[in-house]
From Swiss-Prot:
Descriptive protein name: Maintenance of carboxysome distribution protein A
InterPro entries, alphabetized: CobQ/CobB/MinD/ParA_Nub-bd_dom, DNA_Partitioning_ATPase, McdA, P-loop_NTPase
A cellular-component GO term for this protein: cytoplasm
Assembly notes: Self-associates, associates with McdB.
Gene name per UniProt: mcdA
Origin organism lineage: Bacteria, Pseudomonadati, Pseudomonadota, Gammaproteobacteria, Chromatiales
GO biological process terms, semicolon-separated: carbon fixation
Amino acid sequence: MASNKAFTLAVANLKGGCGKTTISTNISAGLTQRGRVGLVDADPQGALKHWVDWGSKEADAQVPVLYSDHTDPVQNLKLAQPNHDFVVVDCPPSLDMAITCQLMIECDFILIPVLPSPLDLWASTQTIEMIESARKTNPKLKAALVLNQTEPRSAMTRAMQTTIERLGVPVLTTSVRRRAVYRNAVVEGVSVFQLGARGRSAADEINQILNEVIPS
């Protein structure tokens, strides 16, 4: 269970396609400005490993340390925690529900990305139920939903912000806007923090999310 080790943040949603890995990469990049960051890629697709490998080739890049020596992501997490100020975990999809629950027990905070559509919202209820299960072992575990790929002027986005509050899990004030720069960063193998003026608005957005999540 998380205690006085690194602040451990997991990005989790049992539904795929919610932007989980994109948020994980940019959050971990933002945290490198605040301390030592470890990264655990628990998603079998291994997208974070490719990102770290690519990013480490950039001369000015501050790249989190990836823990992937063990096939068991929980073991990788326990190895990372004593050596860093922050650890970010990209959780697996619904194929590995047992592993996700074990990871949650070791975390301080679960961030749940949700796309602004009713189907995605309903699919997230299973993740929320898993968090409640993890809290039986780790009662201090906190969680919040973050709307991803939002369009502020969209009626759907406004309706979702109202509906999502009924799930009983806090919703971050900051949402992740639908921005081409997030896709561009992936293509270039970097984070939005490395894109200069092009990525400034997105980087500010990620920092605002971190300000809401990380204890002051």
